[in-house]
A protein has these predicted regions:
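Terminal amphipathic helices with adjacent charged low-complexity linkers/tails
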Residues: 40-47, 228-245, 300, 306
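Short phosphate-binding/catalytic loops that engage adenosine nucleotides
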Residues: 34, 90, 224, 287, ...
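Short hydrophobic alpha-helical runs that function as membrane-insertion/retention elements
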Residues: 168-172, 226-228, 290, 371
């Protein structure tokens, strides 16, 4: 007998037919003698619909009241799934986040899980109940409902798995696993049998919409084995785990991130400490900087170029305009018509020539590189947005289609 945590996203429970499909998946694991805990998201577009309803009444509602509203979506899903499982004749109980022991920080709308007290869940499991828990939510020290932000249900599932020392945490989505590229865009993308935590974290951070990056961080921290699979088929999924050196793939995936903008500060005086001042100001405003390029100019000046998330571009520009006035730079230039394309693979750290192959693929596709960033398991390039799809196709063909991976 194993203890299994299963998480189902909004598309998996969007209507009655899908809810009964999930009920069948859950009860099949229960019939095998397993203890089963299920985490659910709100149905379909419920969260967006609730936000729209709020905006009709108040364009700027308090974050506390928004959390009170948004937690209703998961409560509906949990109750409906419990009713479907009851209909099939199995013992089941649904719990809200606070009933399941989730205590969070006080940051409404983007709370962090501080601890999970699993005693109520354990008590229900001891009665041989299937336990359904609302994802995405908890309660803070003021006994107020809080939400964990987008993708929070993934994090809820992993947190429960860690608290219960579960044998496996299954994340059900509308795709059959983790692919070498977006299969909707790259028809020859291949499903991976397994991928390391570090690789999955990089892909999640780069915009691969399979797992939330916070959930992957938590899974790695507590060594929780994840399986990403589809609720619409019964096909085997992708295992996310710590992998051995022999299991490491050279390249695990290609990802494209359009949520990026490039900002350049022109004519920065070439003096010690100015780069520190620039990036510390950005950090104070919670503006995350990714790729950085510094070019030395003439007459004792330099240009500093960096990328930020597109929705933070205006705030970064406003901040840097102040910097220009205070420290003698000549101007700020921004461009959001760019995209970041990356390859990820834990095997590249011990295989020279990967960057060369990537750049060759881009050259052959006539794609110009504006900026480059590298780490042990990732290489990213910034290019024109209109060339993004072509670049991903060319890189995927170079690494996965020509060598038969």
């Amino acid at each position: 007998m194993a203890l299994i945590v299963q998480k189902f996203g909004g598309s998996s429970v969007r209507d009655a037919e899908r809810v009964f499909n999930v009920a069948d998946i859950v009860t099949s694991k229960y019939r095998e003698g397993n203890e089963v805990v299920v985490v659910v998201s709100a149905q379909g577009d419920t969260t967006d619909d609730l936000i729209e309803k709020a905006m009709e009444l108040n364009k700027n509602p308090s974050k506390r009241e928004m959390d009170q509203l948004l937690t209703a979506g998961e409560q509906i899903s949990a109750s409906l799934l419990a009713m479907a499982i009851e209909k099939l004749g199995y013992p089941v109980v649904s719990l809200l986040g606070w009933q399941a022991g989730f205590t969070t920080s006080t940051a409404y709308g983007s709370a962090r899980i501080k601890r999970v007290n699993p005693e109520r869940i354990k008590a229900e499991l001891s009665k041989r109940n299937i336990v359904i828990v609302t994802g995405f939510q908890g309660v803070n020290k003021y006994d107020d409902m809080t939400t964990l932000g987008r993708g929070g249900s993934d994090t809820s599932a992993v947190a429960i798995a860690a608290a219960l020392h579960a044998d496996l945490c299954q994340i059900y989505t509308d795709v059959e696993g983790v692919y070498t590229a977006d299969p909707r865009k790259i028809p020859k993308a291949k499903k991976l049998d397994f991928i390391s935590y570090d690789e999955m974290l990089e892909l999640a951070t780069l915009g691969a919409q399979v797992l939330n990056n916070r959930s992957v961080e938590m899974a790695k921290k507590y060594n929780i084995e994840l399986e990403v699979l589809s609720s619409l088929t019964r096909a085997k999924g992708t295992i996310v785990k710590e992998v051995s050196n022999m299991e490491k793939m050279l390249i695990s995936g290609v990802a494209k991130d359009d949520n990026v903008a490039r900002i350049s500060i022109i004519g920065v005086p070439d003096k010690p400490g100015l780069a520190f001042r620039i990036f510390s100001k950005l950090a104070q405003k919670n503006i995350n900087v990714d790729i950085i390029l510094q070019s030395i100019g003439r007459n004792g000046t330099k240009d500093i170029t960096f990328t930020v998330e597109k929705d933070k571009m205006d705030a970064a520009i406003e901040l840097m305009q102040t910097y220009v006035e205070n420290f003698g730079a000549t101007g700020v230039v921004a461009d959001d018509n760019v995209t970041k394309v990356s390859i990820v693979g834990s095997g590249m750290e011990s295989h020279p020539g990967v960057a060369s192959d990537m750049f060759e693929a881009l050259f052959e596709a006539n794609v110009n590189i504006q900026m480059i960033a590298t780490s042990e398991i990732k290489i990213s390039v910034l290019i024109d947005k209109e060339m993004g799809a072509q670049a991903v196709q060319a890189i995927h063909a170079k690494f996965f289609e020509q060598i038969g991976q």
